[in-house]
């Protein structure tokens, strides 16, 4: 069983697609009804940043609960280190929005266009994953994985704006 956590409009067939937003018709709104140790893969694309900072560990512990031993989570988040570098280097093209100057684009990006509550560096996410019980925590590249199962990265988007992290239960 594979879970797309925070699926939005991207709802692949044969995955359990979960989103709390009522505009998306999904079978589940959270992980509560997913049995313990039942899932092989969880993909969470640009979702952890929408969770209040103090609730992130609770979400990661739920991932641990539903993953089978050896199951893997793949999390992608806005890469704030790259964003700061782009800002310092006056790279307006890093920020794909319609604002007319770098400062406005950077400001909009930092709040992930008003949807973000928690931006994490890759190291901060690594610590949170470790503290939640994950192991083999690895930063991976866009469309690359530490697994032989390519399904885990088929939902990747935003190659230049995001970083990708995988961890095993």
What are these regions (language model features)?
Residues 41-47, 56:
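A short beta-strand submotif of the Rossmann-like class I SAM-dependent methyltransferase core
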Residues 3, 18, 78:
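Active-site flanking residues adjacent to catalytic metal/cofactor-binding acidic residues
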Residues 36-37, 70:
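Beta-strand-connecting loops/turns
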Residues 1-8:
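Conserved class I S-adenosyl-L-methionine
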Residues 55-58, 62, 68, 72-168:
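S-adenosyl-L-methionine-dependent methyltransferase catalytic module, highlighting the catalytic core
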Residues 9-36, 44, 141-142, 146, ...:
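Adenosine-cofactor binding site in Rossmann-like domains, unifying the SAM/SAH pocket
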